[in-house]
Amino acid sequence: KRWFTPAFKAANPRVTTTIMEGLAAADDHSYAQLCRCLAHHDLRADLRDIRCPLLLIAGERDSSTPIANQELVAASVPGAQLSVIPEAAHQVTVAAPDTTANLLRAFMDRVTRQTRTELPDD
């Protein structure tokens, strides 16, 4: 339920099984260390220092990284953009690849245009 919504699992059993098997094959010690790092390192005070464009893509039903957490990051980083994918859980790139790609493409196009206008003429 954390990685995919029940509806996605029912509609895409093969994809879900493949992803879950890949996660299960991960080294237990390394995965536990990663989870510990994520749980114990509070970087909220550092967010305001981020000065590069930031796009956050959240799944509406993501219990691992709730939208409230994403909203906190977006509010703390100047100019950050938060996009929420409806009916998606944590694995938004798997559950909604086209939507994710379109969001990334639009973000990169916007950032590229802004950067070009900020560059000095040679």
Model-identified regions with their sequence ranges:
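Short alpha-helix in the alpha/beta-hydrolase fold that links the catalytic acid
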Residues: 36, 43, 52, 66-75
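Glycosyltransferase donor-binding loop in the core domain
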Residues: 23, 62-65, 89-92
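Short beta-strand/loop motif that positions the catalytic acidic residue
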Residues: 50, 56-58, 62
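Structural signature of beta-strand start/N-cap positions in the alpha/beta core
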Residues: 46, 53-55, 78-81
